[in-house]
Amino acid sequence: MRWWDVEPVLGLERVLFPEDAWSAGLFWSELAHARGPGATRRYLVAEAPGDGGGQSLVGYGGLAAVGGTGDIQTIGVLPSWRRAGLGARLLGELLATAAEFGCHEVMLEVRVDNAPAQRLYERFGFTRIGMRRGYYQPGNVDALVMRLENPAAARTPSPPGPANPPDSVNSSDSSPTSTNPPQGTKTHG
């Protein structure tokens, strides 16, 4: 994710998480830790060809990595792009990043009422380890805590959905890395 991605990501964030969307300040703070030799964050965006020949944001994701533990901070996919494998691609890129950062485990929280996301994480090998009561506010929704040990060995499942996911996923400091990118979309950091 680059500075010019913050506004489009905020727009999608508000659509996806209307009750507890991240603020611009929070994204800027995260991006401040995504550069340089001491970087502890990586944020990705996925884009598809938009109207008028430009690119349109269709997804994003972020990881924090400190002390050998990675934490999936966020993953969001435009509703019309769900079940196309984009969430799996973003998650796979974030797990590869966790391995690059030397993480021995990756943690995340997911809403207890978000069964599709839970299934995605379980397909990658995440296990349920706990619950955070009232974690998501203001709705007072509980969070399921999940963990993946050894992200370097994580299995990357095949996407369950239709074709046409993004061509590539780019991070905050790299170029597209997919060896078999789907047609029509690109990602960048």
Indicate residue ranges for each PLM-predicted region:
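Short glycine/proline-centered loop/turn elements that form peptide/ligand docking sites
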Residues: 91, 113-117, 134-139
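Acetyl-CoA-dependent GNAT
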Residues: 3-4, 8-82, 91-101, 149-153, ...
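Conserved G/P- and acidic residue-centered "switch" motifs that form tight phosphate/ATP-binding loops
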Residues: 85-87
